[in-house]
Amino acid sequence: MAEIPDDRRYTKEHEWAREDGGRVVVGITDHAQDQLGDIVFVQLPDPGTEVTAGQPLGEVESTKSVSDVYSPVSGKVIEKNAEAESNPQIVNEDPYGQGWLVAVEAGGDQSELMDAAAYKAFVEEG
């Protein structure tokens, strides 16, 4: 079973959101990176870009496919992980840590997102 930390919330598209001191850090889940396989390219929005919950904010390309990354929250991107763009395999190696993707201004509604237990059940249902 893929790792599912309790300190963040999750989408049905397999993204995570973690509040961090006035911002929401976003990434893809361990399950997502496992399904994608070896990630070879990451495209992220520049700081200042407005993102909308449920809409694509970037993409990841693996040796298997190209997949959109959907924003779990609405707001303005305040930071992107340049390391994930220049070293995409970090998303495979550490999806919940060094492989984060963007940070968005806090304040977006997260009520539609699942907690870890609900996400675990969702993944197990397949």
What residue ranges belong to the model's regions?
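Short, loop-centered acidic/histidine patches that primarily coordinate divalent metals
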Residues: 74, 80, 107
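Short aromatic-glycine motifs in intrinsically disordered, low-complexity regions
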Residues: 63-67
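Histidine- and aromatic-rich ligand-binding microenvironments
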Residues: 68-72
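Acidic, low-complexity mobile loops and tails
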Residues: 1-56, 89, 93-126
